[in-house]
Amino acid sequence: MIKPYYQDEHATIYHGDSLEIMPQLAPASIGQIFTSPPYNKGQPVGNEWTRLDNGYGEHNDNMAHPDYVAWQQNILLECWRLIEENGAIWYQHKPQSKGQNVTLPLELNPGLPLRQIVIWDRGSGFQRDGVHLVPTYEWVMLIAKNDFKVDRTTTDVWKILPNKDPHHPASFPIELPLKALQAGQNTGTVLDPFAGSGTTLRAAKDLNRNSIGIEIDKKYCEIAANRLAQEVLDFG
């Protein structure tokens, strides 16, 4: 196993590619996974693929669509191997407008049991093309094994305002993983294979749970490590 970039009593961060690191983790060793992968939204310039400015750094966020689908399916298959028999994957993604059409993240699921789709109501959005209505929601796909149980009072529409993380252009509010992890009854180790600035890991710490994060960009590994080193509750 590679050496952790950061490790404390409850959290571990690995710097590297998720598809290289996850196979080194033991099967059925993770309680819940909450993750939000890159959306593949970079724009091509000439003949070169581009990355989001100051964004995913090491990751090319404009892959050919079939390659992106295959990549995400492989990620989810590896996530499925890692979760316990009463575990689940919370996979945050969104429908995306492509010309006159919309693509759904359902195609990213390689046939795993999709228990439910949670609607993340962001409260606002942005659209200027005159073709599509303003998008104000995203998805959290709950992919769960048979024995995974949830809180009986949590609904499937979560009204959570987005935050502006100065450290990462594609962050999500900490309330999102907090709500998901608390909705699931499995309190085992939490994994985020796209850890970014460490929001999921920090949520796990605030819930007094162990966590593992994998991040390809060393800059964000350092930011996540600093967040985890804080002793006070993190509010995003």
Tell where the protein language model's regions lie, with residue ranges.
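Cysteine-dependent PTP/DSP-like catalytic domain, specifically the C-terminal lobe
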Residues: 219-236
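Core catalytic lobe of class I
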Residues: 2-222
